[in-house]
Curated annotation (Swiss-Prot):
Residues 254-466 form the Histidine kinase domain. The modification Phosphohistidine is found at H257. Probable member of a two-component regulatory system PcoS/PcoR. May activate PcoR by phosphorylation. Signal peptide: none annotated. It is a multi-pass membrane protein. It is found in: Cell inner membrane. This is Probable sensor protein PcoS. It comes from Escherichia coli.
């Protein structure tokens, strides 16, 4: 089984790693900066003492021990307050002329050896766990100041104080970084827990969601922007889920109602036939009545299977150019006898050719026209208007409603939907005609909608020409 790391742990580790990396880099920069600072400080200090000693050489002679002693006293006075400072003056034969250093100090080897090979550069040496920095310079003297024309001045200093300070600072930073590991992990965990609180709320809501609590929603306003969008989409998902569940509940209720009537009729007629012996004509009438109910059940089953295939994209369309005006005129002629009985008329205007399955489109428009005639008042006109657009053909079917116009016209296309409890729309059918019509139009890549214009209802069909 694959080991999974929680998001809280991941973010905590990432937070800790970033925080520690930044602090360790800061510590490294601090140490490097201090080292550079002490390095420059020592260089300036040694250079200053070197120049001071050079000035003394220009003003003093050292032909005898008295001169050398006087020079040593001047240089020694300049060393007051500078513990760890070493000054050496040698001739070119590496013979010592002056050598001054603090009491109880170990003379560094850099003063004992000839340093003429490295001039005017600060060098660093380590002896007996002590680090020394030194600068040597060759200085010209006048002939009367000695036998040699040049001498070598070497100035060195003990960096023990700096080294001790840096060691203490490094030790402190080391232990601080160790403690920072635990602090970073804790702060990372705490910050992540606070930041992921909206996600835990989403998880809690999802785990507590049941069919009886589909109306629960999250509040995106209380979440950060990065999560509020996700929470809003989460709420949208619940809206779709609630809508789908409501449709499923309505569908289950409606299909039970639709099946109950024919099944009850079949049972009553069968019980009536079995109640006593009857002649052949009575049995024939009962069988014909049962046959009508069975046909109704068969049509309902076929319609349900058609809708199921449509929803799963299994409808096979035999597409070719379809003259909508011709098809609608044929339907007009087909429905005219039914419309004439109540003084209703049907008109078709416009033209348009689309790519589609003529049988499927004929069925879709037949359902729309049938509903328009069935639910319009007597002596009214059902108008069909075709209008060509840039890449499509729009078909508008307008008729006057005989009753109250449904409040939510879009739900007319739902399965078994009734506009009100009195089953205003499609009362004689199974309530699947408009659902089938919508499925056919969508299968052709078109759109179907309904809108109210006063007492009239307009069904708009949009079909692509190609």
């Amino acid at each position: 089984m694959r080991f999974k790391i929680s998001l809280t742990t991941r973010l905590s580790l990432i937070f800790s790693a970033v925080m520690l990396t930044v602090w360790w880099l800061s510590s490294f920069i601090l140490i490097s900066t201090l080292n550079d600072y002490f390095d420059n400080q020592d260089r300036d200090f040694l250079t200053g003492k070197l120049q001071l000693t050079e000035e003394f050489l220009k003003t003093e002679t050292f032909r005898n021990k008295t001169d050398i002693k006087s020079l040593s006293e001047k240089i020694n006075d300049a060393m007051v307050g500078h513990n760890g400072l070493f000054i050496s003056i040698k001739n070119m034969e590496n013979e010592k002329i002056v050598e001054l250093y603090a009491k109880n100090s170990v003379v560094p080897a850099v003063l004992l050896n000839k340093s003429g090979d490295i001039l005017d550069y600060m060098i660093q040496t380590e002896e007996n766990n002590t680090v020394y920095r030194s600068i040597s310079r060759r200085v010209a003297v006048t002939p009367e100041q000695g036998k040699s024309k040049h001498v070598i001045i070497t100035v060195a200093t003990d960096t023990g104080y700096h080294t001790l300070l840096m060691d203490k600072l490094s030790t402190w930073l080391f232990w601080f970084n160790i403690g920072l590991v635990f602090i970073s992990v804790f702060l990372g965990w705490l910050t992540t827990r606070i930041g992921l609180k909206p996600l835990r709320e989403m998880t809690s809501l999802a785990s507590s969601m049941t069919v009886h609590s589909l109306d629960q929603r999250l509040n995106p306003d209380l979440a950060p922007p990065e999560i509020s969008e996700t929470m809003q989409e989460f709420n949208n998902m619940f809206d779709r889920l609630e809508g789908a569940f409501r449709k499923l509940s309505d569908f289950s209720s409606d299909i039970a109602h639709e099946l109950r009537t024919p099944v009850s009729n079949l049972m009553m007629q069968t019980q009536f036939a079995l109640a006593k012996e009857r002649d052949v004509s009575h049995y024939r009438e009962i069988l014909f009545a049962n046959l009508e109910e069975l046909k109704r059940l068969s049509r309902m089953t076929s319609d349900m299977l058609f809708l199921a295939r449509s929803e799963h994209g299994l409808l096979r369309l035999d597409k070719h150019d379809v003259d909508l005006a011709a098809e609608l005129n044929e339907l007009r002629e087909l429905f005219e006898p039914l419309a004439d009985e109540t003084g209703k008329t049907i008109t078709v205007e416009g033209e348009g050719v689309v790519a589609g399955d003529s049988d499927m489109l004929r069925r879709a428009f037949s359902n729309l026209l049938s509903n328009a005639i069935k639910y319009s008042p007597d002596n009214t006109c059902t108008a069909i208007h075709l209008e060509r657009d840039s890449d499509c053909v729009n078909v508008m079917i307008t008729n006057t409603m005989s009753g109250q116009v449904p409040a939510n016209l879009e739900r007319l296309f739902d399965r078994f939907y009734r506009a009100d409890s009195s089953r205003f729309y499609n009362t004689e059918g199974a309530g699947l005609g408009l659902s089938i019509t919508r499925s056919i139009i969508h299968a052709h890549g078109g759109e179907l909608s309904a809108e109210q214009q006063g007492r009239e209802i307009v069904f708009k069909v949009r079909l692509l020409m190609d």
